[in-house]
């Protein structure tokens, strides 16, 4: 039997549907973010990254880089084992304490990625609650969906950010059935925010637990970077907060923060935590440095919001189809998978601008887009270059513009 035919067939389907993904070979340069070297088929080229999740540029911050180098030099590279077998090193313990403090919780638990923290965290927590009903927002991330699926618990999906729909499901479940509401605080493809205070109201009214993914908000919102929950004053009302070290903090890893009993139970039962090597000491020290810095420095957050607002204003003024967003995410609607890929290719190859196309299954078919993520280091000149390049690409591909604004805000 020719087993390769099955894989070729699967890949052919992706090509036919115009959603086969090609990775750009990039080399970031510390001190020059958002500039990078693109190792293209035709050789090296200088490009500007407009889609990085290193939202605040902390991956190049001297404190963060310095902490990583110092720790690696002092203690070596790897963790040396799982958490249970020689892998619970001191920088990791310090990082978990820093995260617990960030979110005002008794404890925190680290995982190898934000995907794993959601997948393993939700699955383990829900499994430990007899007859648990999980109420999940329809736009939750794949990692949350997989965690819910692996829990084996009953799941009901409520319409995105629809409080009436959520309340109807809570009411139908009854006061005595255990319930877990799972949602994100900031949805990364549309840039909209969950009404966390009102979700907490419903959870308290109907005796439900809450699990909130703050992956795209930690570091960037709240007076100390605790996320949307901190900004909205509801951290203490949310049972489990989940986040990542790989975006605003510029490092690697995921975590959950909660009361001591929940964290201890997940630590003791979660396969995705127990049976894997711990995060390296240098990564943990770097993440701790990033968190400590952002707890006291507001420059990065303020500059980030300023840059995002300017990008939206300039692109809207140019008549480009900027989708509505209340946050730092700037989605640019295209609505066609092939043209979305073509737009991305033209921006990179002809303008030295890297924006990865966002196609199905990340977003629904017909809602394909370019997802732009400004950083504090995208200056006015780069923003103007972006707008001009996008207009040229839109014209080249025959993509529609909307009516231009009179001026940038």
From Swiss-Prot:
One of its GO terms (biological process) is protoporphyrinogen IX biosynthetic process. Disulfide bonds: none annotated. Coiled coil: none annotated. Its cofactor is pyridoxal 5'-phosphate. The keyword Ribosomal protein does not apply. The modification N6-(pyridoxal phosphate)lysine is found at residue 247. Pathway: Porphyrin-containing compound metabolism; protoporphyrin-IX biosynthesis; 5-aminolevulinate from glycine: step 1/1. Pfam families: Aminotran_1_2 (PF00155). It catalyses: succinyl-CoA + glycine + H(+) = 5-aminolevulinate + CO2 + CoA. Pyridoxal 5'-phosphate binds at residues 188, 216, 244, 276-277. Keywords: Acyltransferase, Heme biosynthesis, Pyridoxal phosphate, Transferase. The keyword Magnesium does not apply. Its EC number is 2.3.1.37. Substrate binds at residues 21, 136, 362. The active site is at residue 247. PANTHER family: 2-AMINO-3-KETOBUTYRATE COENZYME A LIGASE, MITOCHONDRIAL, CLASS II AMINOTRANSFERASE/8-AMINO-7-OXONONANOATE SYNTHASE. Homodimer. Belongs to the class-II pyridoxal-phosphate-dependent aminotransferase family. This is 5-aminolevulinate synthase. It comes from Bradyrhizobium diazoefficiens (strain JCM 10833 / BCRC 13528 / IAM 13628 / NBRC 14792 / USDA 110). The lineage of its organism: Bacteria, Pseudomonadati, Pseudomonadota, Alphaproteobacteria, Hyphomicrobiales. The gene is hemA.
């Amino acid at each position: 039997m020719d087993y390769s035919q099955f894989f070729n067939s699967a890949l052919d389907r992706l090509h036919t549907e115009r959603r086969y993904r090609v990775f750009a070979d990039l080399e970031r340069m510390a001190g020059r973010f958002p500039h990078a070297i693109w190792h293209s088929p035709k050789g090296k080229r200088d490009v500007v990254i407009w889609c990085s999740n290193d939202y605040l540029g902390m991956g190049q911050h001297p404190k963060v880089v310095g902490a990583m180098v110092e720790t690696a030099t002092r203690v070596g590279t790897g963790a040396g084992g799982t958490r249970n077998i020689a892998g619970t090193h001191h920088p990791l313990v310090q990082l978990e304490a820093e995260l617990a403090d960030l979110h005002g919780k008794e404890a925190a638990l680290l995982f190898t990625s934000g995907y794993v923290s959601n997948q393993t965290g939700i699955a383990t927590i829900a499994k430990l609650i007899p007859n648990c009903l999980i109420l999940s927002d329809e736009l939750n991330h794949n990692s949350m969906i997989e965690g819910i699926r692996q829990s084996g618990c009953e799941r009901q999906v409520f319409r995105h950010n629809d409080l009436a729909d959520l309340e109807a499901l809570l009411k139908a479940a009854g006061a005595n059935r255990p319930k877990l509401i799972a949602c994100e605080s900031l949805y990364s493809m549309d840039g909209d925010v969950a009404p966390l205070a009102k979700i907490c109201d419903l959870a308290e009214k109907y005796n439900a637990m809450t699990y909130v993914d703050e992956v795209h908000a930690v570091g960037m919102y709240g007076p100390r970077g605790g996320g949307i929950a901190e900004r909205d004053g509801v951290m203490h009302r949310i049972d489990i907060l989940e986040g990542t070290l790989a975006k605003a903090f510029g490092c690697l890893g995921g975590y959950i923060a909660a009361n001591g009993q929940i964290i201890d139970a997940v630590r003791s039962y979660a396969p995705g935590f127990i049976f894997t090597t711990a995060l390296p000491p240098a990564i943990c020290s770097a993440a701790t440095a990033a968190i400590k810095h952002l707890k006291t420095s507001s420059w990065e957050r303020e500059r980030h919001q300023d840059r995002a607002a300017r990008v939206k204003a300039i692109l809207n003024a140019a008549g480009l189809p900027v989708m509505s967003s209340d946050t730092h995410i700037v989605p640019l609607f295209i609505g066609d998978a092939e043209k979305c890929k073509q737009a991305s290719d033209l921006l990179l190859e002809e303008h030295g601008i890297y924006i990865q196309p966002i196609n199905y299954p990340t977003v629904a078919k017909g809602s394909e887009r370019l997802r732009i993520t400004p950083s504090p280091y995208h200056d006015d000149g780069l923003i103007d270059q972006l707008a001009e390049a996008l207009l040229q690409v839109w014209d080249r591909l025959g993509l529609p513009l909307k009516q231009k604004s009179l001026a940038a805000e």
